[in-house]
Amino acid sequence: MKKTFLTIIAFLLALSINAQEWVGINKSVHKRIQEKLISSSENSIIVDVDINGFYKETVKTDKGDMLIISGEDMAAMPIKGAPNLPMYPISMIVGDYAEMEIAIIKSEYVDFENVDVAPSKGNFSRQINPDDVPYTYGDMYQEDAFYPAQQASLGEPYILRDFRAQNMMVYPYSYNPVTKTLRVYTYMRIEAKKVSDNGVNQKVNRKRNNKVAPEVNALYERRFINYPSKETRYSFLEEEGEMLIVCVDEY
């Protein structure tokens, strides 16, 4: 019984993988999106992003066969009626008070013609069968313009333990529904720059730890692209020590 169950799981996974077809830009071999920190300071964070291709999946719509575009480690933009394209978040540490703005310093792209990209079905409850949700087409399907218009944006600042952070949202793919052109940004240099000390959700009067436990340090390294530049400011607690607890006899 167990062997049969595992066989079924393997079969379903194979179907899921085979449903998507990899389209490489320079090579046929799949390569996930690459991010690289170029520089990081209190006033500026510069990141390079390289994209080697995308996955396409054919779906049936009332307008015929269309494509859903996706990428590894990316999330679909959940805007109902908009072209179903993925976005990629990059988490970064920002100043405790900083208001940041984002800009594309330079970029390169490749256009794919005669591509029909399906619209997103948006967000809905897990109790709803996705196949029961119809495809609807938003106003952008009537506009001769690329969507999204920007290739990067900033999320709301948030506090994670010792740091104030912000997500750099990267949009490597954009689509013009009128010309049926899919634009793939194969390279982007993105800068998040401090413009003031009037940012929202400021980290005020919160003491930062001088020592960071190894597991927390590992969390920071995985999450924040610019965390290594902070390492010289903090010492890490490499091993657990003994604790002295003082209390009255009743306890």
Locate the predicted segments by residue.
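Extracellular pro-sequences of secreted precursors
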Residues: 19-251
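Bacterial Sec-dependent N-terminal signal peptides
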Residues: 1-21
